[in-house]
UniProtKB/Swiss-Prot annotation:
Biological role stated in the UniProt entry: Catalyzes the isomerization of 5-dehydro-4-deoxy-D-glucuronate to 3-deoxy-D-glycero-2,5-hexodiulosonate.
Protein name (Swiss-Prot/TrEMBL): 4-deoxy-L-threo-5-hexosulose-uronate ketol-isomerase
Keywords, alphabetical: Isomerase, Metal-binding, Zinc
Residues noted as binding Zn(2+) in the record, renumbered to the chain: H196, H198, E203, H245
The organism of origin for this protein: Shigella sonnei (strain Ss046)
Cofactor notes: Binds 1 zinc ion per subunit.
NCBIfam families, per database record: PRK00924.1 (NF002091)
EC number assigned by the record: 5.3.1.17
Length: 278
């Protein structure tokens, strides 16, 4: 488990390129036949990836010890979106088939969660966010047909994109975790511009569906003290509440966003005008 401490905005603005990457970038999300796990002190979110190829991968008691509990989800909820080939997730003996861009919400109290790929030639890639939970909501599969999509932006401003809301109150109940998948239309490069912060929630972006020769310049920092982190395919970045979170790519891309914090009101944002950015 890679533990990341919280960081003050006054400290963050003094960091060089490597310093920013050390604090906020999750460089390697998927490793064959293993789970990766980054624990952030910011709202206690855990992010990572699971890519089973030659064997199943379970997340259970061994993680619980690191969290000071008996098992991983004793006091947590889990959200998973599969960006790879078809797979399965077995939760306490109940098997769910999770296809490409299907998702699974796992409620607090699940003792054993086992991940598998159906075809080793096209393994599943399970990206997950995990947050503290105060009660148990039912485990539920969500397919792309069941999400709440919103299309925003314009080709003229190069920010036309569809926001697919997987884990939001309109789709299912969670304690605090919200997750979704945003896909840019071909030829569009910008996400979340004009940008915003949300003082009441933190967020993690996971960029994927990118060519090897492409990158995204992820914008972060306070609106008057912006910085950037160069992101490549299948990398994630942690965004504190005080930071903007926007990006521009050399080509179109897709990203998964996950939020935890005070509320689940998607539109609870502190908008920042482009003219006010520095």
């Amino acid at each position: 488990m890679d533990v990341r401490q919280s960081i003050h905005s006054a400290h963050a603005k003094t960091l060089d390129t490597q310093g920013l990457r050390n604090e906020f970038l999750v460089e390697k999300v998927f490793v064959a036949d293993e789970y990766t796990m980054v624990y952030s002190h910011i709202d206690r979110i855990i992010v990572g990836g699971i890519m089973p190829i030659t064997k199943t991968v379970s997340v259970g008691g061994e993680v619980g010890k690191q969290l000071g509990v008996s098992y991983f989800l004793e006091r947590r909820e889990l959200g998973v979106i599969n960006i790879g080939g078809a797979g399965t997730i077995t939760v306490d003996g109940q098997c769910y088939e999770i296809g490409h861009r299907d998702a699974l919400y796992v409620g607090k109290g699940a003792k054993e969660v086992v991940f598998a790929s159906i075809d080793t030639a096209t393994p599943a890639k399970f990206y997950y966010n995990c947050a503290p939970a105060h009660t148990t909501y039912p485990t539920k599969k969500v397919t792309p047909d069941e999400v709440s999509p919103v299309t925003l932006g314009d080709n003229l401003t190069s920010n036309r994109r569809t926001i697919n809301k997987y884990f939001v109150p309109d789709v299912l109940e969670t304690c605090q975790l919200s997750m979704g998948l945003t896909e840019l239309a071909p030829g569009n490069l910008w996400n979340t511009m004009p940008c915003h912060t949300h003082e009441r929630r933190m967020e993690v972006y996971f960029y994927f569906n990118m060519d090897d020769d492409a990158c995204v310049f992820h914008m972060m920092g306070q609106p008057q003290e912006t910085r950037h982190i160069v992101m490549h395919n299948e990398q994630a970045v942690i965004s504190p509440s005080w930071s903007i979170h926007s990006g521009v790519g050399t080509k179109a891309y897709t990203f998964i966003w996950g939020m935890v914090g005070e509320n689940q009101v998607f539109d609870d944002m502190d908008h920042v005008a482009v003219k006010d950015l520095r």
